[in-house]
């Protein structure tokens, strides 16, 4: 099914490429045309980008920006195909780390280092820790647009009603979950119909249970083995939470379980800080992923990563494309992002008392103050390894695989990836 979908995407993009080759990136009236591709065809991001483009075009009447957007999972396939054509988008969305690095190694992304160096008024206003995940071999290839990280959300009203405190350790998390379940609440909302939600737990648990040097080696496509016992222990920890998740985790998606949390049917959810606005009006509290006895990784590391945009190495208009990205990541547009969308700009000082709640500002500070960041797991490893991991864990959650069996499948995928990387 996935191969058929990819075939259809290739066919459709090929037809568009043929059509695109007959036109010019500069129109007859002298305007420069830029193609802008992102992953938010739905509100509120859809209107946000349309309004940003409209304002930019008003200030730059010689530039016309054509927007195209597809949803998350479709985007991952389509952008890879589009960048392989002779008419790729000039500006395109990208997750950071390995997802972006593949495009860089494939010469699909423009080196933006000179823009960072020559326009420090712009580059210095970015949160510096958010630039690094788009940096490859000491060169900058992407512009961070928004910051995001994981945290446990909890319903303060439910916790106060049952006289519960936010857990600081794993044992306390289990104890709190037991008490919530005894009082008729679903302790933790979790939906894995779309498997990306699994990667957030796995990324965090691997960081806690496996030492950093081993993880770095295993996450590298050329050297990954995944034989350390910490990976099995991480999955066993996830298994310990299974009695406290909602029923049928593999049959429901994240949006559904988030709504369950919002309606007060569940008391906790491991969510992205960018989702705070989506669970209003819950009396919301947050706590970091609890410390685990015997863990090898730091509790001060935060799971999360920036998302941003890159410019195609094939663009005929790098200057104009960069002008748009600098406009998109200006302080004014960053403040608009926080206010209109509820996401957090990678521009410093954009979450204020005027456009963000106290807990949103707390979330931003949490990211800025983090000692280190743990990238989204499925964006930090080879896609074959990620698929083996997420499919295996989904089966484990359904009772069809053990942690050991999951890791055997991951080790097999890693071996194949190593062979192809040689």
Curated annotation (Swiss-Prot):
Keyword annotations for this protein, in alphabetical order, are: Cell membrane, Lipoprotein, Membrane, Palmitate, Signal, Transport
Q: Say yes or no: keyword Signal present.
A: yes
Membrane topology recorded in Swiss-Prot or TrEMBL:
Lipid-anchor
A Pfam family found in this protein is: SBP_bac_1
Q: Where in the cell is it found?
A: Cell membrane
Query: InterPro entries in the record, alphabetically?
Result: Bact_solute-bd_prot1 (IPR050490), SBP (IPR006059)
Write out the N-palmitoyl cysteine lipidation residues. Answer: 21
Family assignment from sequence similarity? Belongs to the bacterial solute-binding protein 1 family.
Q: What is this protein called?
A: Uncharacterized ABC transporter extracellular-binding protein YurO
Q: Which gene encodes it?
A: yurO
